Amino acid sequence: MAIQLLPPQLANQIAAGEVVERPASVVKELVENSLDAGATRVDIDIDKGGSKLIRIRDNGAGIAKDELALALSRHATSKVHTLDDLEAILSFGFRGEALASISSVSRLTLTSKTAEQSEAWQAYAEGSQMDVKVTPAAHPQGSTIEVVDLFFNTPARRRFLKSDKTEFTHIDEWLKRIAIVRSDIHFTLTHNAKLVRQYRPANTDIQTQQRLAQICGRAFADQALSIACEHDDFVLTGYLQSPQDTVITDTNFFYVNGRLIRDRLVNHAVKQAFAEYGIEHQPGYVLMLSLDPHQVDVNVHPAKHEVRFHQSRYVHDFILQAVRSALVEMPALPLSDELEHHDNVAPMHTESNLMHDVKVVDTAEDEFTLNHGSSKAINSVSQFGSMHVPGKNNGLSGGYSAAIKPSYDKKPSSASSAQTKTAIANYGQLLHTPMNSAVSYVHEAAPQVTMPPLLAGEHWVICKDDKLSLLPIKSVLLAVRKKDVETKLANGLVSQPLLMPVSIAADLDWIETLAVRDQLLRQMGIELTIRFQQLIIKKVPPYLRECQLAIVIPELLQWIQLEQPTQSAIVGWLAQQSLSQFEPAQALWLQFCSLDDETQQTCYAQERIIPWQNWMKDN
């Protein structure tokens, strides 16, 4: 059979097989076009689950008369014009296929008016007929698209549609997901002329919480942990299901630059953070990640449900650290009086409730940050050290004035209060072992501690008598980590499997090194194998999670190949590598105050005296 170009009608119907899967796919494409057009209100009318009628009405910028026919053509778009535009996409649409594909399998009417036009115009296209008829019409500024008799000319596709109720449920579920991230938009949804959903714009915190409860349920909203973290070009905001809420939920929404996607990296990061509290089920979350569009490729899936991150491991660990921080700040789990005196539940003097005793002197953003130094040194990199809270409050998409806070100060839901005593006791035991490994040796009877103010996220300002000095945070962090590693190393460190094992070229000598130092590596929580001349790094202790493993592990093997390191040397090496991990300033100060006097004095010996008396004399 000879090779020939496909007719435009057939090409559009083939493309429709990828773009238009069901009525919900049509709604998704058309609503996203409305949002790209700057609409602040979108009305969605559905008849018979979308198989009979889908009408989308918006108040966006509209389409000019001369562009109406072109808008229904394949690969016609106003959103990208150059390759550079394609590599930095912030709009929902960019391929120019949706309208052409939809019009090829339905009877489509597009009515639109721009602010510059004195009258509206209407374009009509039907199925395989590629001719577009443009006629005058009456319409306010914006656009209305009617899709009638979906799949009328493709009976095989129409037979695969489910019941009207099922198809409408898919539309309703998709609208919920977009209504969360676009809390500034007024959405309405009607089915068979009956108003089903109305999401009013959320311009205040209370309205935002109301929309969250409307979409995710009151139980989720009442107990959810709010999260807002920023590091370099990454900003993560949203909500996490509280560990106190044991109700299994399907609220797993993740957005990248406002686009709803599915990504296993996110599920793994959230689940790993919760697993450190002993919570094995998949927790609910609504997370919105904003980053440089050059760092993510959205043009990898026909329906744009997936993206490809240029630094997927970096994104995973950023989300992991942000969720860990949210759980650290989580209020202590409320226990009944009977359970508080249960023999199996120890008093919970953990980081979570000790945080209530900390008085923060400096209210600047730097209270929530730790900057561990230059990014040039691998062992000193603070990969997420400058994570802080954006100061501007702008609904779900914006920042928050506190790093992590409960959404509501209300009583736990009935589902939470109905937990069995055994389950609550187990939670209490889990909370007794704080999420952050470095807090495990904090004294049970910790006194009230006032954290000194931070300077540039790198020093604490210490005022004692008439002396003013700067205490380097990095030296304190190193001392705390050494103490933590020393405490745990004797019994062996816990291994954490990598989401994606790291593979590097292996030296011939490493086989013997792994055999000779096998016990040492196991004690350090490191699992390595060699296959096909490749060293595969499978598991590492928490202290190495943020390291450049492809560099650090070979250096370790070279070191232990030449000598048998002492325990103190291993402690120092692991502590040094762990400096790249994020640690909240308040938690670190608590840990520092719990160190023995000798270790504290060693840290204080590194402080820098500020000659403030001389400055006063000079002035």
UniProtKB/Swiss-Prot annotation:
Superkingdom field: Bacteria
GO CC, alphabetical: mismatch repair complex
> What InterPro entries does its record include?
DNA_mismatch_repair_CS (IPR014762), DNA_mismatch_repair_MutL (IPR020667), DNA_mismatch_S5_2-like (IPR013507), HATPase_C_sf (IPR036890), MutL/Mlh/PMS (IPR002099), MutL/Mlh/Pms-like (IPR038973), MutL_C (IPR014790), MutL_C_regsub (IPR042121)
The UniProt keyword set, sorted, is: DNA damage, DNA repair
Q: Which GO terms describe its molecular function?
A: ATP binding; ATP hydrolysis activity; ATP-dependent DNA damage sensor activity; mismatched DNA binding
Q: Which GO terms describe its biological process?
A: mismatch repair
In this entry, which stretches build a coiled coil? none
List, alphabetically, the NCBIfam families matched: mutl, PRK00095.1-1
**Sequence similarity:** Belongs to the DNA mismatch repair MutL/HexB family.
> What the protein does?
This protein is involved in the repair of mismatches in DNA. It is required for dam-dependent methyl-directed DNA mismatch repair. May act as a 'molecular matchmaker', a protein that promotes the formation of a stable complex between two or more DNA-binding proteins in an ATP-dependent manner without itself being part of a final effector complex.
The identity of this protein, by name, is: DNA mismatch repair protein MutL
| Organism the protein comes from | Shewanella frigidimarina (strain NCIMB 400)
